[in-house]
Amino acid sequence: MSRTSAGELDVLKVQLKTWERQFLEENGRSPIKEDIKAHPEIRRKYKEYTSLKKLLSKGNAAVTGQKHGSPSRATHPTPQKHIDAEIELGPTPQIYGKVVSLFEMHISPLKKVPVRQLDADSSETCISPDLHSQDVAQSELLTDISCQAKRQLDFSVTPHASPVKAVQPLLLNAPDLRFEAIPHARTKYGPNSPVKFDGDVTLTLSQTPLQAKLAQASEGYSPSPLIKRPAKPLSQLAKEYEDIVEELKEVDHAAAVRNLGGLLQQEEENTQEAEAAEPSATRSDRKRRKNKVRPALVTLEEEIPQGNLHEQLVKLRQKALDKFNGNDPNDSSDEEKKTSATSAKPAKARKRKYNTVSDNFRRLKLPTKNTRNGRWRRR
């Protein structure tokens, strides 16, 4: 069925393509839907071609679905491991019902350490045959103990430091010295002690080359000036000290003069403010009512200096000059008393009036002598 339909589809496709080319050569354009409807035979072939193409596409889809379908696989459960009986652990460290102590630990068996045979003509120190036989016997004994099922620990305390060895003085011209491992370490310490040296460990000490210091000291030139210590002579240091002392004196004098000038200027400002604060007697009562700002009450008694500071300084200078010239200071004191008596004037007691609240308002705006209201003049 599928082969015949595929062959018919190919035949119809060839027939339709030949007709389309003939139509293109005759009319100069490709056929459209109206041209196909005008030829019933060609229309029937187009319908048959589309139906066969649909059948072939459905058959191919069914075949591909069967081809890629995965068969059902049988599920095999994962085999479970054999579960041993649960191990019960109590409050004390134990395993399999047996109490475990710190001394019952599993230690791996010791390995046999091969002993290197040293030649007679070698530069290294050789071990005596008695010590060698003793080491071999001890290693065999340790291997026999390790093969047993249980072991008993040695309770001897292992030292925390290596033994002290008497160091021999080294000669400068001696050749390179090579020390073999300490032969007594095998007999004194256990096989697993960290202090024990193996048989193939060697320590090499080489001679440090000496520098020819005497040859350098015998050279006939002076050292570089950069290496010398940068120091000043005592005369220069004394001169710098005197300059610093003079500068400090000048600074102190300038500060004292500046402070005196500031005090004099502040005194003049205070006197000007006091003169400006005194009320004038020619002011009218109406203008006084407008000024409602009153000074605050004085809580602390301020110490006001008596007299003018500038005048006092002038007097002191005059006294010093009179004393230097040999004049009598009593005459100057009498003059000071006269000037102080004339300058001291009795302070006038100012009468203060208690202003009521009603004084802030005016009931009628009547004409007065000092008013400049023009509306009363026009009547």
From Swiss-Prot:
- Which Gene3D superfamilies does the protein's record reference? 1.10.10.1460
An example Gene Ontology CC term for this record: DNA replication preinitiation complex
- List where Acidic residues composition bias occurs: 266-276
- GO molecular function term, any single one: single-stranded DNA binding
Q: Bias regions of kind Polar residues — which residues?
A: 67-78
Signal sequence: where? Answer: none
Compartment(s): Cytoplasm; Nucleus
A single GO BP term for this record reads:
double-strand break repair via break-induced replication
- Region entry Disordered: which residue ranges? 60-79, 263-292, 322-379
Q: What's the stated role of this polypeptide?
A: Has a role in the initiation of DNA replication. Required at S-phase checkpoint.
Q: Which family does the record assign?
A: Belongs to the SLD2 family.
* Name this polypeptide is given: DNA replication regulator SLD2
Q: What is the lineage of its organism?
A: Eukaryota, Fungi, Dikarya, Ascomycota, Saccharomycotina
